[in-house]
Amino acid sequence: LGKQQYKGEVDLKAFEAFQNACKHPLIYNGDINSVEDIHRIQEQFPGLAGMMIGRGLLANPALALEYRQNRALEFDEMREKLQSMHKCVYNQYAEQLEGGDEQLLNKMKTFWEYLMPQADRKLLKAIHKSTSLKKYNQAILAFFNQR
């Protein structure tokens, strides 16, 4: 077995060989970014005990819901869910972190590293370049007000 981390492509042939040799319940993990990816892996490896979604869920926080409901969320519905999740994470960090505004700002900017990569680059750049919570919150407001 090798250690690939986040580089390269998933080696599905190696995974299949491992699955065939493995006597234990097996969980698939690797490059699941859409409902289609989930279905493809389920078809290709029907004996799986489960899947770990990871960064795909960070990029699209509604991925599990879309899978469960077998439909893509509408833009406004996605925005509402993302805004709710952001508010929850922001408030939890604000409550628990003891390093002040700068620590909260850095944590929240990290939150956006994988989140919504298909979003408007200008708006994401404004979030990442914000130097104060005031500027961050302005950038977030602009992000959630986009059409």
Give a label for each model feature.
Residues 1-8:
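Short, small-residue-enriched loops and turns at beta-alpha junctions
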